[in-house]
């Protein structure tokens, strides 16, 4: 029976099989012999073979390793399509942009990212259902549970805390903002437009509402609220409003457009209005950043945030 178990154990190896043995186990004082099954498997000569002895060399005799500087990374061709996430990643750290978007090194999403995805998916499916029939809070919370992504969190306590916070966010949203008679015109609306003749921008509107000729682009946020000054300077909202003025997307005028950040944690809404001239300037600013990306060698930008890099 022992021989059979030994054989079964050996046949479970997928790439390599290591057989180890010791002359003494635990507090035993009498030296033990190697199992005869090992001799049967490998042969006596292989088991009794002694490894060649190598005299230890002084570490001082070794030449220090000279690290060769890493060659700058240069894409094969100019990058011609961007999203808001790509642009902000480059602004944060060019090296992270290179790893994530050019070399496409996969990273596992964090718990906070999965939390945001779960909330967005629950709201999206809730409104889709509301377009077909009457819905209640129980529908929204059931969809939240069904869409919950339960990985990436630092601990089970972290996951439970965020799940509870999300439940409170959605309950507040339903009680204070949901109206069955006033549903969005578009949900999770994908868009792409040409910022210049050669540069395409892609993205997704969380929600688009229309009242006569007035359009409101709503972006749900699960994180910390920003103030009006930060919202007015938001590159993300500038990009959304630029997209909304494109004839192939909404074709709205600057005067008829409002961009709103909806902070689900507090129920706070902060809206942004831009003039036609301000959107033209925003377009220039985005073009300059993209020009920097295409001229970059994607060197790292070290800082305290490196400890949190995926």
Question: Locations of the language-model features?
Answer:
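Hydrophobic (often cysteine-bearing) scaffold residues that line and stabilize catalytic clefts
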Residues: 2-6, 111, 115, 119, ...
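C-terminal, charged and often intrinsically disordered regions of DNA end-processing helicases
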Residues: 39-129, 166, 181, 185
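A non-catalytic, helix-rich entry segment at domain boundaries
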Residues: 122-195
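Short, polar/flexible loop-turn hinges at active-site or ligand-entry regions and domain interfaces
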Residues: 25-27, 105-112, 129-134, 225-227, ...
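C-terminal accessory regions
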Residues: 1-46, 59, 89, 290-310
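Polybasic (Lys/Arg-rich)
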Residues: 70, 79, 276-308
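Substrate-binding beta-hairpin/strand module that engages nucleic acids
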Residues: 18-20, 24-34, 135-144, 184, ...
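Mg2+/Mn2+-dependent nuclease catalytic core
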Residues: 192-283
